[in-house]
A protein has these predicted regions:
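Helix-start (N-cap) detector for alpha-helical repeat units in TPR-like alpha-solenoids
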Residues: 37, 44, 78-79, 112-113, ...
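Terminal, low-structured helical/coil segments at or just beyond the last alpha-helical repeat
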Residues: 26-40, 239-294
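Long, contiguous interaction/recruitment modules in multidomain scaffold/adaptor proteins
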Residues: 1-42, 56, 65-69, 279-294
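TPR/TPR-like (Sel1-like) alpha-helical repeat modules
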Residues: 204, 208, 214, 218-249, ...
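Structural signature of tandem alpha-helical TPR/SEL1-like repeats
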Residues: 56-66, 90-103, 124-137, 158-171, ...
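Alpha-helical segment of the N-proximal tetratricopeptide repeat
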Residues: 40-79, 83-93, 120, 124, ...
Length: 294
């Protein structure tokens, strides 16, 4: 699965802010209308909700325009900067996103969601130690958020701090037993550290929670094939690739935190005639994106 959860903070937390909106919806007010600071702020906050709705339908450019205007109308409201920063990150403008999120943090230093988003952005930039620091600070303010624990586990994993990574993934699972991406990633760590049987067990557990989850199925297939259980491995691998052919791409797997050991075995697996044929037959078929539990 994608190793960050885009727009989680926007969609999950804007609904909790209970933003007070003007009595009547107004797209753009006449410039001649005199408005006090409070009215301007309300208009800015109203625009943030418009932007969120646009982002839900992946209309990011339109959402960005409204978010930018919202920061001008309500520059002292952390919500507007938080939304703008999150949209920048979603569109891979990471430096601008971090700058906007830092502004949001200066306005609301106790808002954990800002720190979670900063941690995610720093992770995407490869600043793993900084990501750990932001995520840890956020979790002190708001503990037991599965997505944040998952991100923290990923940052530790990239720093090769494997026990810490597993601990954070396990905390995420303890909070949400159906959060299979964390279970899957424990398997990734186990495999890289030589515990093949342990990895397979975690991947099978992850697969049991979502019958559309291609990643843990393919990982299990590769591990079984490498162990010598070739027929079962090939059959499971075929099924996984039919679910989502993106996982037949080594670069995509690396982006999803598959380690060197597993990638090496996967390369061999993908070169087998049966899997090559499955991949070829899957070309052009629309992938069924895995659904991250909310």
């Amino acid at each position: 699965v994608p190793k960050h959860i885009p727009l989680f903070s926007i969609f999950a937390l804007l609904s909790l802010w209970s933003v007070a909106l003007p009595a009547q919806s107004q797209a753009l007010l006449p410039y001649t209308l005199q408005m006090d600071a409070k009215e301007l702020e309300q208009q800015g906050l109203s625009l943030t909700q418009d932007a969120v709705q646009l982002a839900r339908f992946q209309q990011y450019e339109l959402a960005m325009q409204r978010a930018q205007l919202a920061t001008q109308l309500a520059p002292k409201s952390f919500q507007t900067w938080f939304l703008l920063g999150s949209l920048y990150i979603q569109t891979e403008k990471l430096d601008q996103g971090i700058e906007a999120l830092q502004t949001a943090r200066s306005l609301a230093p106790k808002e954990a969601s800002i720190l979670f988003s900063l941690g995610s952005a720093r992770f995407q930039k490869g600043q793993y130690s900084a990501a750990v620091a932001d995520l840890q600070t956020g979790l002190k303010l708001k503990p037991d958020v599965p997505e944040a624990l998952f991100d923290l586990g990923n940052a530790y994993y990239k720093l090769n701090q494997f026990p810490q990574a597993i601990a954070q993934y396990q905390k995420a699972v303890n909070k949400d037993a159906k959060f299979w991406p964390a279970i899957n990633n424990i398997g990734l760590v186990k495999y890289e550290t030589g515990d093949v049987n342990g990895a397979i067990q975690y991947w099978r557990n992850a697969s049991s929670l979502d019958d559309k989850a291609a990643e843990p199925r393919l990982a299990t297939a590769v591990a079984l094939y490498a162990k010598g259980d070739k027929e079962q491995g090939l059959a499971l691998g075929e099924a996984a690739i039919k679910l989502d052919s993106r996982y037949a791409d080594l670069k995509f797997l690396e982006e999803n935190l598959w380690g060197n050991r597993l990638l090496k075995e996967t390369q061999k697996f993908l070169e087998t005639p049966r899997i090559k044929e499955t991949v070829a037959n899957s070309q052009g078929e629309p992938a069924q994106p895995e659904v991250v539990p909310q």
